[in-house]
Swiss-Prot record:
Organism from which the protein derives: Pyrococcus furiosus (strain ATCC 43587 / DSM 3638 / JCM 8422 / Vc1)
Gene3D superfamilies tied to this protein: Aspartate carbamoyltransferase regulatory subunit, C-terminal domain (2.30.30.20), Aspartate carbamoyltransferase regulatory subunit, N-terminal domain (3.30.70.140)
Stated name of the protein: Aspartate carbamoyltransferase regulatory chain
Cofactor: Zn(2+)
Co-factor binding comment: Binds 1 zinc ion per subunit.
A GO biological-process term: 'de novo' pyrimidine nucleobase biosynthetic process
Pfam (any one): PyrI_C
This protein's GO CC annotations: aspartate carbamoyltransferase complex
Binding-site positions, Zn(2+): 108, 113, 136, 139
Protein family membership: Belongs to the PyrI family.
Function: Involved in allosteric regulation of aspartate carbamoyltransferase.
Taxonomic placement: Archaea, Methanobacteriati, Methanobacteriota, Thermococci, Thermococcales
Subunit and partners: Contains catalytic and regulatory chains.
Molecular function as annotated in GO: metal ion binding
Keyword Cell cycle assigned: no
Amino acid sequence: MAELKVSAIKEGTVIDHIPAGKGLKVIQILGLGELKNGGAVLLAMNVPSKKLGRKDIVKVEGKFLSEEEVNKIALVAPTATVNIIREYKVVEKFKVEIPDVIEGILKCGNPNCITHYEYVTPKFYVISKEPLKVRCHYCERTMEEEEILANL
């Protein structure tokens, strides 16, 4: 099997084990196309993986993720692993995890929900992680994966 050759990053974050085809969505929801620090963003798509068969990898130079950003990744790519890189070495590694309660990172798909009209933080309860299903705290609308991804 051919070896994947991608340059190492000195400081930043590597998001690994993203399901194949979801890497662009990860870049989009994190707003990595508008990085202000001048750091590179690298996307490797459809890379061979022992765990997933095929996977995507995102490398972000000079950026470390917030808890909110990690939670967003979990909604798009629940199998992802986040690696924190300092001085070219992995100093921290963890799997993303879908939280039981999601606040402030997802919009309700119900156009009549109070979250669209009042100054309240959208809040959802995770009903199921596989397949992903959430319920709005305010209007009780249930959303499944496709609608969740459209409302991130």
